[in-house]
């Protein structure tokens, strides 16, 4: 029997995803992702409010990892291999869809493509069940990146982490990332680092692993530590003229700040918030209060 192809490019039999333009591509892509997940046993929902999560997926799996990524166990209560009761796992999926563009370089010779996507600091939830899913109908690949795996990959490869998280565009601007590419041998790479373990069936294997639900608190703390290591570094980027001593001073300040006790950090944040309340012009306060992060975190200037 031929191995199941995932994702199924013909999940909608009467229409092709490439028939849609960029103006409605996002919604079509989310439907395409949802139907492919349903096809392998996930129950998929859409959040009532748009908080940066596009889909919520749930599935029953064996707590010891015996459930295959494409198994549908909606009618079973126990694992057929070990007899343990199944547990329900949850994934909060953020879908990123882009047109995959051909790299126009002499070296590529028309045989390499890059996937440009945008991620901002607010997208990085401190929850191991949060997942980035990158998809383009040009390659028909799902690149499935659970939060912990994504951060750990860039932490392990420090040069990638600095390029990704330390530049000003990560905190302001659109932070468009164009490092991920696919070569003529169907390998997804970022500056020589392979992303193949996150693609299609392999990515679904990672997504279906129950460890993030079973050890939720432990992996939440690990993500916090990774974010401290990756986010609290400063790099001026290519366009900003900042001296090396200034960069060193800023990074030393970050190091001191994140090593403080939680109470001291909370006190500094409270003082900073109070200064914003007193010093910001009223029109800017209004803009901040209506912004995404402040709105959903309940802060009011």
Curated annotation (Swiss-Prot):
Question: What outcome is documented for mutating residue 66 to K in this protein?
Answer: 50% of wild-type activity
Top EC class, one word:
hydrolase
- EC code: 3.1.21.4
Q: Which reaction does it catalyse?
A: Endonucleolytic cleavage of DNA to give specific double-stranded fragments with terminal 5'-phosphates
Please verify whether the record's keywords include Secreted: no
Annotated GO biological process: DNA restriction-modification system
Temperature dependence is: Is one of the thermostable restriction enzymes that remain active after 20 to 30 cycles of thermal PCR cycling.
* Cofactor list: Zn(2+)
Q: How is the cofactor bound?
A: Binds 1 zinc ion per subunit.
Q: Which GO terms describe its molecular function?
A: type II site-specific deoxyribonuclease activity; zinc ion binding
Mark the CHC2-type zinc finger spans by residue number. Answer: 62-82
| Record note on what altering residue 82 to K does | 10% of wild-type activity
Which N-terminal residues, if any, form the signal peptide?
none
Q: How is it used?
A: Could be used to screen carcinogenic mutations in a restriction endonuclease-mediated selective PCR (or REMS-PCR) assay. In particular, could be used to detect the vast majority of mutations that occur at codons 12 or 13 of the Ras oncogenes that encode glycine (codons GGN) at those positions.
**Record keywords:** Endonuclease, Hydrolase, Metal-binding, Nuclease, Restriction system, Zinc, Zinc-finger
Report the superkingdom from the record: Bacteria
Q: Report quaternary structure and partners.
A: Heterotetramer of two alpha and two beta subunits. The alpha subunit is believed to be responsible for DNA recognition, while the beta subunit is thought to mediate cleavage.
From the Swiss-Prot or TrEMBL record, give the protein name: Type II restriction enzyme BslI subunit beta
Q: Which organism is it from?
A: Bacillus sp. (strain NEB-606)
